[in-house]
């Protein structure tokens, strides 16, 4: 047995030795053969002209090392092959499928290392999937290493795609297919390390993405001197791409992020930071087709921060639309994909904070909106120094508007929204606010009848709320220590009639848009103010947003009003001046979009009225005497109630309708029943006319008698 076993071992060892010798000989022989025949094989089988000074091939492992390589295309204009032109200092390939490379034109390797490559790469033309063209990948690099390379990558039509200098790159599990290139996600990989300078990426000949330097350290990428530069002007972009709506220009001192993942048609980034970004948005009049796909892949961003940014948006004519300065923001868990793009908010998000200063917005040629700061997070929004101001004076405004329109002037030192929630339920926007606080607001509303009437009815607040397309609810609103002024003028007024409400404090409950079924749609407004700055006034105003007739109730009580204070209001229209004390004014109006009606009651002490001429300069003494004669002192007596009934024939605003109701009540209370005055005046005129007629008759009678007497004397003289 021992002899047989020893003999078997000798035979086995001898066989192994023979195989090793044969393997070595084959490897050496193949290596020798390949070195001598590879140029001829490349010439016959490869689409490239390749020269080298050193080549080492291991047939067993598929490892290849080549040095001082020069490469170029045999057919530079063939768009079906990847174009390669340039040199490589050293090339190291591990586990290459040699026969696939030589005979099937497919490069399949575990690892490839390029040392000092200076290459110009032209991508092959994407395959037409509809024609069933073979989409087999010509290059399969699992792991890629680049050391100190200068790379230019062009599209098949020679348009620039990527340029980078001094590139050092490490990619693991790298994949690239024609399909991904077509969908704008050209590569996917598991991990990376990169550094380079003067990076340029061109997107659809619309933008150049530039970076002075790119580097990674400990998994974090830093991009310095970033620029997203448009290749077209705003006008050229609008003409060439009529279905695109915005052109962007972006610069940033530095961008950093980590945990970049390109996988399964998804891009993921974390800890994204922008330092001093400057964003310019140039809008056009283009409209994107509804069927257009907005996202070819998913984007996930976690923990984004922006520091000291500026944002400017331009209108299609190049003028400023809005501007944000000194912007700082933080946001996490952002998701953008095809599904989210269908919603009113085109992305999902988690916690966020935002702060900006010197915000300016031009909503149109008549106004400019600005604020000194805006600070917000998931729970609270604070606005400082809000202003909404006209861009022209009242005369210019009246000349420029085609029809009658109110002119607003608004200044608010501080606005707070506390406990708000913005959701995107079923791709529909929904906003809910617990508390809205407005501090020390100044609002002036000026209305003029000088321009032609607007045939379009002015909408009340209930209709304005109904027209908001998404559910909006503000549970509690407070207007604190504010001033509201309403002025109106017409052709006959020498100065605008003016109402003012100082020390205005208002509580509003349940502002809503009547978009949530089963929810309360009644809005209640409770207010306290000083009418004309001196007279305590309370107001209760209610309306139902869901009421199609825009019905409302408006109840007010005014006390201790110096009658002279209302002259600014009544003199321009009624041509009346008052003095004395108005003890109280009470009215309870019910109205809708067709008119207003209700009781108006005023008590007074020593109230005197002066009727003026149309220029409000001369007193009509006699009519003033008669008017005051008919006005009774209501102290201690039951005052007379005026029943207001005013029709909204001109379809003016709610403020105008309230004005007309109050004006009607004041006119009835101050002047009284004008028919009595008119009757008295008519009676006096009639009596005066009768007296005059009697006097004239007597004069005529005396003249007749005198004429007869004179005739008799003349006749007597003739006889004599």
What are the language-model segments listed below?
Residues 2-12, 540-545, 550, 557, ...:
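Extended terminal
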Residues 2-47, 158:
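N-terminal type II signal-anchor transmembrane helix
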Residues 16, 234, 393-395, 452-456:
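Acidic/polar low-complexity surface segments
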Residues 48-49, 53-126, 132-165, 172-227, ...:
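Flexible beta-edge/linker motif
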Residues 122-130, 286-290, 451-457, 573, ...:
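Flexible, surface-exposed loop regions and adjacent strand-edge segments
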Residues 131-154, 291-316, 355-357, 420-425, ...:
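Solvent-exposed beta-strand/coil patches in large extracellular/periplasmic or lumenal scaffold regions
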Residues 159-164, 319-324, 449, 454:
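Extended intrinsically disordered, low-complexity coil regions enriched in Ser, Thr, Gly, Ala
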Residues 229, 279, 389, 530, ...:
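Short, solvent-exposed aromatic-acidic interface loops
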């Amino acid at each position: 047995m021992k002899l047989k076993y020893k003999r078997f071992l000798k035979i086995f060892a001898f066989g192994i030795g023979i195989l090793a010798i044969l393997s070595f000989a084959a490897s050496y022989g193949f290596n020798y053969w390949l070195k001598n025949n590879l140029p001829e094989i490349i010439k016959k089988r490869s689409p490239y002209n390749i020269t080298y000074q050193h080549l080492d091939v291991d047939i067993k492992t598929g490892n290849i090392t080549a040095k001082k390589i020069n490469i170029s295309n045999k057919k530079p204009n063939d768009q079906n092959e990847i174009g390669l032109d340039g040199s490589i200092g050293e090339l190291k390939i591990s586990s290459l499928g040699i026969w696939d490379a030589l005979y099937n034109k497919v490069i399949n390797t575990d690892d490839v290392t390029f040392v000092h490559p200076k290459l110009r790469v032209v991508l092959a033309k994407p395959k037409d999937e509809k024609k069933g063209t073979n989409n087999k990948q010509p290059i399969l690099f699992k792991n890629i290493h680049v050391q100190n390379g200068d790379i230019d990558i062009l599209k098949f039509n020679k348009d620039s795609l990527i340029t980078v200098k001094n590139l050092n790159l490490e990619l693991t599990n790298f994949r690239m297919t024609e399909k991904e290139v077509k969908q704008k996600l050209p590569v996917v990989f598991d991990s990376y390390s990169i550094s380079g300078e003067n990076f340029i990426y061109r997107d659809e000949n619309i933008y150049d993405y530039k970076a002075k330097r790119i580097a990674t350290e400990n998994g974090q990428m830093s991009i310095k001197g970033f620029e997203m530069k448009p290749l077209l002007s705003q006008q050229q972009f609008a003409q060439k791409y009529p279905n695109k709506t915005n052109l962007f220009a972006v610069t940033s001192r530095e961008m950093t992020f980590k945990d970049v993942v390109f996988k399964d048609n998804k891009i993921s980034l974390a800890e994204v930071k922008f330092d001093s970004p400057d964003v310019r948005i140039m809008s056009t009049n283009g409209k994107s087709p509804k069927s257009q796909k907005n996202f070819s892949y998913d984007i996930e961003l976690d923990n984004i921060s922006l520091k000291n940014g500026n944002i400017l948006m331009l209108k299609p004519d190049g003028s400023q639309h809005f501007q944000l300065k000194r912007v700082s923001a933080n946001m996490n868990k952002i998701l953008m994909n095809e599904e989210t793009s269908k919603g009113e908010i085109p992305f999902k998000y988690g916690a966020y904070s935002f702060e900006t200063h010197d915000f300016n917005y031009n909503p149109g040629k008549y106004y400019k909106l600005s604020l000194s700061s805006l600070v917000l997070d998931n729970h609270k929004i604070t606005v400082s120094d809000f202003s909404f101001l006209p861009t022209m004076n009242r005369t210019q405004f009246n000349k420029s508007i085609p029809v009658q329109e109110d002119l607003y002037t608004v200044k608010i030192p501080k606005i707070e929204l506390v406990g708000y929630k913005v959701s995107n339920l079923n791709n529909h926007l929904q906003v809910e606010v617990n508390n809205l606080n407005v501090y020390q607001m100044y609002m002036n509303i000026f209305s003029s009848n000088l321009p032609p009437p607007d045939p379009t009815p002015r909408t009340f607040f209930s209709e304005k709320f109904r027209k908001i397309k998404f559910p909006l609810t503000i549970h509690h609103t407070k207007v604190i220590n504010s001033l509201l002024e309403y002025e109106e003028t017409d052709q006959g007024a020498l100065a605008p009639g003016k109402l003012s409400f100082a020390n205005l404090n208002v509580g509003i409950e349940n502002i809503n848009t009547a978009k949530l079924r089963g929810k309360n749609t009644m809005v209640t407004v409770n207010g306290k103010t000083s009418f004309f700055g001196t007279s305590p006034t309370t107001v209760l105003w209610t309306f139902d947003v869901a009421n199609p007739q825009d019905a409302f109730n408006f109840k007010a009580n005014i006390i201790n009003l110096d009658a002279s204070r209302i002259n600014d209001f009544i003199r321009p229209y009624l041509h009346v001046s008052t003095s004395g004390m108005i003890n109280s004014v009470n009215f309870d109006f019910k109205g809708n979009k067709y008119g207003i009606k209700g009781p108006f009651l005023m008590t007074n002490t020593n109230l005197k009225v002066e009727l003026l001429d149309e220029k409000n300069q001369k007193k009509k003494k006699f009519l003033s005497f008669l008017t005051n004669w008919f006005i009774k002192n209501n102290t201690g007596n039951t005052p007379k109630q005026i029943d207001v009934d005013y029709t909204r024939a001109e379809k003016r605003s709610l403020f105008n309708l309230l004005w007309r109701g109050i004006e009607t009540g004041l006119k009835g209370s101050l002047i009284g029943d004008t028919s009595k005055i008119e009757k008295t005046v008519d009676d006096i005129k009639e009596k005066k006319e009768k007296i005059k007629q009697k006097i004239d008759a007597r004069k005529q009678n005396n003249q007749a008698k005198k004429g007869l007497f004179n005739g008799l004397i003349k006749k007597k003289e003739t006889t004599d």
